[in-house]
């Protein structure tokens, strides 16, 4: 059972979080399997009412420390690395407001190199009155979920487990026992980091029960 199927089954009450799970291993890459696949995930394009295009575009510039590769009346492209754009925002006439509870993309996630970078970003955005709606240590990641002006969810995260140990982590039973995670207070976590507590220790998932799914912000 894939992690996504496992999560879906848990939300539907099909299985109990009793620690039972199939053995996990990192699948071979498409290239290793002799397949031709995309070289990379290039960008995400968001559509919004024309009058909000630049507000949404500016939000992503602030959150991602991005710059506009191209900007016009209809919207623009935001980059923060060597890709010409990672986020595009386009104003479409006649677009209706976001409706909670409909099928579609849940969120887009951005990974930081270390917890200190995530902490810096949290306090930087706090000064801009941009705060996470939900903060949770999933086990594999420490994650904060934000809403953009159109209520699209954006996850800012850091990996808790080195890439080469992911398969081992999924096989040790911790994730199977709780594939959702444990909520945390970013103020508390990052102040402990500033006080000198080891990043390795702070990335460990704290003891506790997973939140009820009703606690997750709707979008």
Where are these regions (language model features)?
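Core segments of cupin and vicinal oxygen chelate
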Residues: 35, 46-87, 91
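Eukaryotic phosphotyrosine signaling hubs
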Residues: 41-43, 103-108
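Long, compositionally biased, intrinsically disordered segments
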Residues: 60, 101, 109-111
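Short acidic N-proximal helix/loop "leader" segments that mark the beginning
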Residues: 3-39
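Short glycine-biased active-site loop of nucleotidyltransferases that positions the nucleotide triphosphate
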Residues: 79-81, 97-100, 145
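Vicinal oxygen chelate
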Residues: 47-54, 108-219
